Curated annotation (Swiss-Prot):
Function recorded in the entry: Core subunit of the mitochondrial membrane respiratory chain NADH dehydrogenase (Complex I) that is believed to belong to the minimal assembly required for catalysis. Complex I functions in the transfer of electrons from NADH to the respiratory chain. The immediate electron acceptor for the enzyme is believed to be ubiquinone.
Name assigned to this protein: NADH-ubiquinone oxidoreductase chain 4
Transmembrane residue ranges: 1-21, 34-54, 63-85, 89-111, 118-138, 156-176
Gene: MT-ND4
Lineage: Eukaryota, Metazoa, Chordata, Craniata, Vertebrata
Entries under InterPro entries matching the protein: NADH_UbQ_OxRdtase (IPR003918), ND/Mrp_TM (IPR001750)
Amino acid sequence: PIAGSMVLAAILLKLGGYGIIRMMQIMPTTKTDMFLPLVVLALWGAVLANLTCLQQTDLKSLIAYSSISHMGLVAAAIIIQTPWGLSGGMTLMIAHGFTSSALFCLANTTYERTHTRILILTRGFHNILPMATTWWLLTNLMNIATPPTTNFTSELLIMSALFNWCPTTIIMLGLSMLITASYSLHMFLSTQMGPPPSNNLTEPSHSREHLLMILHIMPLLMISLKSELII
């Protein structure tokens, strides 16, 4: 059920990040070097999850692994126990909650029309449903963390915090963000570009689907304009 996936990615997955925040309060704040293996594991997990995304042919699995990779960045940012890291982790949890929920919603609208989640079989929607293609583009740009979205603010905070804490982490951070951009563009091109399905009568977009996407995207843009509400 798509509602379960949306709630799982947007809310329940972020409870793990909240648990890390609470656990870090009882850890020493001075000797953060002891957390270096945990930070490396979190970032390496994010890179591996991103590489797994590149191998996926199932649209829903790709979005699910994308959520895991972003939580790796959140975990690394929270573990170092700096104000910027904590702000970036919390902001990314909120931003990616909206983004992953929107991606699952779009995947479901595609599935309702094609009855398949295989990427190569869902192509050609830019000619049939141009408005849905616009939503796909905006949501993937949010997933890549392009300005002026809240995702950009959060990833900038996380990158600054981790780089100030240990400059070497920029290697895995940069690799993770590069792969994120790669699979996001791959997901957009695979689902929207190419020849449309010839034997499939596609029903038009409904207003409720557009309203759902507006309610996912508008909060992110509004929060980025007044980011001091979170940071």
